[in-house]
Amino acid sequence: MSTEYSADSSKSFMIAMQSMIDTSQTFNLDRSKISLPDFDDELKKVQKDEQNQRTELTVLSQDRNDWDDIFEEFKDISFAQLQSIIDSYKTKNAVAVYKKIGKLINEAETTLSSNVLLETVLQMVYKHQKQELEKELLDFLGTGNIDLVSLLLQHRRMIVATPIETTILLIKNAVNSTPEFLTQQDIRNQVLKSAEDAKNRKLNPATKIIKYPHVFRKYEAGSTTAMAFAGQKFTLPVGTTRMSYNTHEEIIIPAADQASNKNYLYTKLLKISDLDHFCKTVFPYETLNQIQSLVYPVAYKTNENMLICAPTGAGKTDIALLTIINTIKQFSVVNGENEIDIQYDDFKVIYVAPLKALAAEIVDKFSKKLAPFNIQVRELTGDMQLTKAEILATQVIVTTPEKWDVVTRKANGDNDLVSKVKLLIIDEVHLLHEDRGSVIETLVARTLRQVESSQSMIRIIGLSATLPNFMDVADFLGVNRQIGMFYFDQSFRPKPLEQQLLGCRGKAGSRQSKENIDKVAYDKLSEMIQRGYQVMVFVHSRKETVKSARNFIKLAESNHEVDLFAPDPIEKDKYSRSLVKNRDKDMKEIFQFGFGIHHAGMARSDRNLTEKMFKDGAIKVLCCTATLAWGVNLPADCVIIKGTQVYDSKKGGFIDLGISDVIQIFGRGGRPGFGSANGTGILCTSNDRLDHYVSLITQQHPIESRFGSKLVDNLNAEISLGSVTNVDEAIEWLGYTYMFVRMRKNPFTYGIDWEEIANDPQLYERRRKMIVVAARRLHALQMIVFDEVSMHFIAKDLGRVSSDFYLLNESVEIFNQMCDPRATEADVLSMISMSSEFDGIKFREEESKELKRLSDESVECQIGSQLDTPQGKANVLLQAYISQTRIFDSALSSDSNYVAQNSVRICRALFLIGVNRRWGKFSNVMLNICKSIEKRLWAFDHPLCQFDLPENIIRRIRDTKPSMEHLLELEADELGELVHNKKAGSRLYKILSRFPKINIEAEIFPITTNVMRIHIALGPDFVWDSRIHGDAQFFWVFVEESDKSQILHFEKFILNRRQLNNQHEMDFMIPLSDPLPPQVVVKVVSDTWIGCESTHAISFQHLIRPFNETLQTKLLKLRPLPTSALQNPLIESIYPFKYFNPMQTMTFYTLYNTNENAFVGSPTGSGKTIVAELAIWHAFKTFPGKKIVYIAPMKALVRERVDDWRKKITPVTGDKVVELTGDSLPDPKDVHDATIVITTPEKFDGISRNWQTRKFVQDVSLIIMDEIHLLASDRGPILEMIVSRMNYISSQTKQPVRLLGMSTAVSNAYDMAGWLGVKDHGLYNFPSSVRPVPLKMYIDGFPDNLAFCPLMKTMNKPVFMAIKQHSPDKPALIFVASRRQTRLTALDLIHLCGMEDNPRRFLNIDDEEELQYYLSQVTDDTLKLSLQFGIGLHHAGLVQKDRSISHQLFQKNKIQILIATSTLAWGVNLPAHLVIIKGTQFFDAKIEGYRDMDLTDILQMMGRAGRPAYDTTGTAIVYTKESKKMFYKHFLNVGFPVESSLHKVLDDHLGAEITSGSITNKQEALDFLSWTFLFRRAHHNPTYYGIEDDTSTAGVSEHLSSLIDSTLENLRESQCVLLHGDDIVATPFLSISSYYYISHLTIRQLLKQIHDHATFQEVLRWLSLAVEYNELPVRGGEIIMNEEMSQQSRYSVESTFTDEFELPMWDPHVKTFLLLQAHLSRVDLPIADYIQDTVSVLDQSLRILQAYIDVASELGYFHTVLTMIKMMQCIKQGYWYEDDPVSVLPGLQLRRIKDYTFSEQGFIEMTPQQKKKKLLTLEEIGRFGYKKLLNVFDQLTFGMTESEDTKKRFVSVCQRLPVLEGMKFEEQENNEVLTFYSKHLSSKHNNGFEVYCDKFPKIQKELWFLIGHKGDELLMIKRCQPKQMNKEVIIHCDLFIPEEIRGEELQFSLINDALGLRYDMVHKLIS
């Protein structure tokens, strides 16, 4: 019999009560109307009055009672709980027990409130068994509350008989009751009394219910369709029936009535045709549905965050698509109607799907929909990894919550990816209440904080099924309730769904229960099939699909209903043929009965076939798993969930099917466009879980947070990420979580009483306590450092690793206890199996035999636990997984996969923990275990087993066990014989060639007695196969002690295909112990390949530790010397101070009163410039008229000195100061007149090489070398040669040359002094403490495993915090490694400023107009933005004006922060209170990787800390990798020993001396070497220079002699010297190399390629290949730009660099080639860095071309010389050879000379007159007068309006063109000399002889080539320069005439090297 709410229903009483609550509007309580279930009158009244259930809640007036207040204690009680109350009160003595418990709780000695204590204690009672409970209660309550503990233990069974919420209420009520036994009437009276008491209380005024515009529901309140949005519980929907049968109980919830939903019926559907082009393209149907139409205005036309709660199947995915299209639209430019230009690289969309299967479906759907826009959609899950390139190329990434958490929580995070996210879509957001909900909370909180900190827009969209408390979720997602919160009830479902919930009798899991479920499921299945429906039956294991199908067929046969399920004969026949070849017997068999199966274990083809058959109606019943519901869009008329017990391997047992799965499965019932009018969803469960699913489906429970249980791990993740650095930030972070929202709404659930929330509404103190407790836990586990004084957090390696690999803190605790550096494989496997991740792996009796079998068959390592423990079971399963043993039990197989999946992650974490702790053996074991799990192969197995080889071959290899070394030596035939299979030989040979192998070469360089530098070169030796090796291979490089116990150094090495043929170099420092170990071992191990390991032992047998004799000059307590000690009032007037500082006082006598050489080592900022000036004053006094040379290592330093001394010295003494650098080429007369020459090492080296012909070099009396410690750098050899050469010059000229070396403190000062010829009283080596402003130094370490960019990103927040701590209102200087980093650092600091109360805290400009004035002057956009926040930028990529503005504002303290590259430390004297060195590495193009900065650079940067006269102390903070901390700590304090690097580049320097005649034989070369620093250090540190065998004086000399031999051989190979025994003769090519300061290797490569008739393209290639361009930087990301430039260039890289010249796109010579072409084509360069790079390329190009012209002339290649001269003209003017030379003039556009039919070579060699035709030439224009030139300008510009300034400039340039009157020759001196001269026609030519080269970055002087030739034979060439004679400008030169050509008639050409001017004439020589 079926009636609505029958009296025998267990729910009837509460339903009755609920109805009365809903209908009581005035609450005038009548005792007769409140009754218990045995009062039939009231029940009948309820049954008749259905309208009462639909009555809306009215707003109560102030004088009426509020039911919520009256029944405060009962408001959250469900039906079952109230029934439990009644049952409990019927129990004898229950009240007395509860009363006593309540009394003892109130009297308990504890700091907790009674409410919290009661709940906490009861949770223990419910959670633990009696044995555990006693210990837990005593630990918690203590012995002082022993009575309470005893009472709880005694009555535990009674207490847990009722739900915990009921027990809490019973105890509270019992405290005030007296009777020990209550009748039913007593209970009723007590309820009424509570109501009466509540009635008399003063009530708060009722609040008005707010109506929200987008909440669409049938009822406002009173039913579940109206939703319990405030977290209340309501009854079932109207029309619900409940029926009871013998086998089951059934509740049917009718489908929603769409007819009464006005919003659904009358919503105007938006037509797709009315929408824009984007929507028309994506949506192929005519209209949007109701929900989509209502959501469209907000989803598509705003950027509001949104929450869309709607039934499954209502079209939420397309709503998500609308928001995606909106995002795409924002990054698109529409050109015309259908042309759309999308900025693909500027945005990312993240779609977070709950399951991988759903992610795959979304990817498939979105890919098709967005294909017209070329939008890439890819899956990023545990199964589908993406490479960095794929991530960059993808716009829409579909991922899972856990995967996106992993991506965003890593500090090495794909920061570019995260920063580009503009839309985050979270599907199934109702998962918040499940275990995975905490992950969603973490993601949203992290995203919201990122939005706030970065001030960037990330839109968040939440998609959900209907939620009970959706407003809370909306608040959590940051949704505006009035705009973005959408709720649609079940009536909006396109196909209404009838839900049938069946509770089958019998104990859950019992046989009876299973049989009842099978029977009931069949009955429902049969019923639906009879209606003509197709049905999906969902089961919960793959095996169960077939089992259920067979069971249904069996029941159908027994009921004679087989024909009911029979498939349609036509469809059956159609698919029978397809199934004939199918191997799945089960599938074929059950198909005959109209059944199908579908699960993830089937082949994809079989799954696709099943789906197609179901769609076509060939099968009526499909038995499937839940993956079908999530992953495939395959609807059915009816879905049946058969059973709700799902095996969870994480918990090691069966759990309830999640509500999200139920909703998703039900969502497949009755999809639009398929089958019946309504859908049907049937759930078959056990009777005890029926109420649970009823409450879930009808949303009777609000969604609560699960975040609290994961707080410790999530806090660690945020600390490791760097987003939370202190307690306050952590409290703020918690405020973004859903837990915070619910804690305030429902505090009792979270252990918070109402009193606490009343006193602290924002729960600040509660959150603080939670954070502090969690932080203490992390601190105790050594995962973070928690300073409880400052409340700051510091991440540690263990915490970072735990965060990156998702380790639980409980597991970390276990590992801390069990990790052992000597652990074996068995120990490690036992430890892994004890992880808390495997606590849920429970032992079940039925699997004992299977486990025993697995233990016997597959366990290779001893198991430390019993098989019946979680640890023992996990261990066996893991070893079985590695051994690839088959597991038959499905639950055990699931457990095995779970264990293996998690073990990989845990092992990787443990490996990194071992590496970070420097445990060699442990790390090796862990890496082997990692690879074993990943490859499913034991580490001791043969490496070839990793390849896909036949079983018999594998078996043979395992039997013979040949080593890989042996196999690699065999040929294919021999390999075939080895495995007894000749055919397999070639395959094995191919496989072996692809097995990764790395060759290692190592060199050692002792630095000090305790530190050694190791240089290793790694050479890959295998064939790359993308199918095997993918895009990259990962290796670990370890340096271990000989016993492998201790790791001395480690690095991760990434090898990609393009680098396969390169040698990879690494440099690192290791400590040396005492006594010295016999050897260290360099080991390179593959990260993935088993057995792939290379080792190289470095023996210390012949190692000699260096002898670094030094001294530290102690600062004597002298009275400061007054400036009057100079005894020269003129000089004294220069100085603004009265006294020298202590360091200057100590050095004064030696420098000012003697002519002794001196070395002064002192920290930066200690006043060394004054020391140099003291030496200068002495030189002025002692050697008047002599020159002083000041050598600074950088042009910026030179400029600083020039500016300073020109202001300081020249006006006072009259002595001129001249700059001599590559940028400044002064007139020779200026150099001659100057007293002080300030230059760079390279420039002075080039000049002094020809000292015999340069008098000013011979006149030098003092050389000051600043920063001489740079000897150790690449430029150090130049300084060595200068010193050696000047000493040599001094010995030759007998004129003394004083040397002054200035440096920071060095640790081998005696060697430095000895080399400089310094005596004891001239040696000063002061410690860092002599600084006028004392320096505080901090060195902070960061994770070693981070790549460069993520590492820099990680440092930004610590930089910001350091500025706030150390320099909150004083200047701070931040040094970074690259120009790009200045920009990225500035942007991050701006984001962090945005989170401050005062975002402009670093800006000290109050006047907005003043700020705008500065901003208007700035060109760079980033600088313009950053200046508004008080942050300046300074690097070479900025234009000079931008740099000057930054410099000026920082100097004036208008801005507080300046971010600069390291060059600023050298070039600009700009001190600050705080200096932060952000990273100690920079990118080096030579090694295509990052290398450490020189210590000298770091010291120089640190030297900028502390402002004299402003600061009492300065602060310097160095951020580096953790492994480098000790290195910098040692050497930054002690000083670094300086070594020579001359031996690496001796070739060119020795060549220069050979050219000058200083060296004519090998003995002289050796003698010259004895003057060098190299000679001295080779004796004191022989091992560093490769001297191992014989380290005696004779042995060192022999080594240096062999060094000279090899150097001379190199020069000979370059055709630069001729060797005759010991004599050395320089060739002209060596003279050319030395004169133009280019490498002999450049000459060598040119001589290999040069020929006559070279093309323009060939010359351009030769120029690009010059060795001088080796160091042109190629930065990350420039390869793509180079490829694009190559495609757009005249000469592509592919067509130019062919055969032996083939070069990759990342080669600096290729970049040079492309930049030169871009310069000639005058095209815009893609990035600012390329502009500066082009300047560098052009700077070198002319010097190299001059050398090339001389080489070609020497070889007599006439045509090649002409081409090279043309190349020089083109480079200077920035045009191509066929462009009109006239068109380079001001105001004209480049134009080609048309209508020529000559070849390229012919065109280059044509004279201007030949080219002329109808065009004017430069020579003609140069002869015109002023008016004519104005007419010519109008003619050339076609009358287009140009500014007057441009016209004037055109005229001015034309009037100064170096047009000549002609060529004249005279012969003299016995006809041996031919004199040529000509003169300028223009009298307006400037005296500087500058020529117009507008596109060249430096000023160019007039220069002519005079070429004499006969036909194609080049006979003579001479460079001619103009000079002023009287009022005329004359070009004059003398040519030597060889005897053999006298009397010949020669053709002479005079060609300008910059302009298209050429003069030709024929002259016959006199015989």
From Swiss-Prot:
Subcellular localization: Cytoplasm, Cytosol
Domain Helicase ATP-binding: 297-485, 1149-1324
Listed InterPro entries: AAA+_ATPase, C2_domain_sf, DEAD/DEAH_box_helicase_dom, Hel308_SKI2-like, Helicase_ATP-bd, Helicase_C-like, P-loop_NTPase, Sec63-dom
GO biological process, alphabetically ordered: cytoplasmic translation; defense response to virus; regulation of translation; rescue of stalled ribosome; ribosome disassembly; ribosome-associated ubiquitin-dependent protein catabolic process
Residue sites binding ATP per the record: 310-317, 1162-1169
Domain Helicase C-terminal: 516-735, 1355-1550
A single Gene Ontology CC term: cytoplasmic stress granule
Annotated EC: 3.6.4.13
Main localization category: cytoplasm
Domain named SEC63: residues: 795-1100, 1626-1776
Motif stretch (DEAH box): 1266-1269
Effect of residue 316 to R: Abolishes splitting of stalled ribosomes. Defective activation of the ribosome quality control (RQC) pathway. Does not affect the association of the RQT complex with ribosomes
Top EC class of this enzyme: hydrolase
Subunit (UniProt): Component of the RQT (ribosome quality control trigger) complex, composed of SLH1, CUE3, and RQT4. Interacts with CUE3. Interacts with RQT4. Interacts with HEL2. Associates with translating ribosomes.
PANTHER family, A to Z: ACTIVATING SIGNAL COINTEGRATOR 1 COMPLEX SUBUNIT 3, DNA POLYMERASE THETA, PUTATIVE (AFU_ORTHOLOGUE AFUA_1G05260)-RELATED
Function: Involved in activation of the ribosome quality control (RQC) pathway, a pathway that degrades nascent peptide chains during problematic translation. Drives the splitting of stalled ribosomes that are polyubiquitinated in a HEL2-dependent manner, as part of the ribosome quality control trigger (RQT) complex. Also represses the translation of non-poly(A) mRNAs together with SKI2. May block translation by inhibiting translation initiation factor 5B (FUN12) action on mRNAs lacking a 3' poly(A) structure.
Other comment: Present with 486 molecules/cell in log phase SD medium.
Protein name: RQC trigger complex helicase SLH1
Gene: SLH1
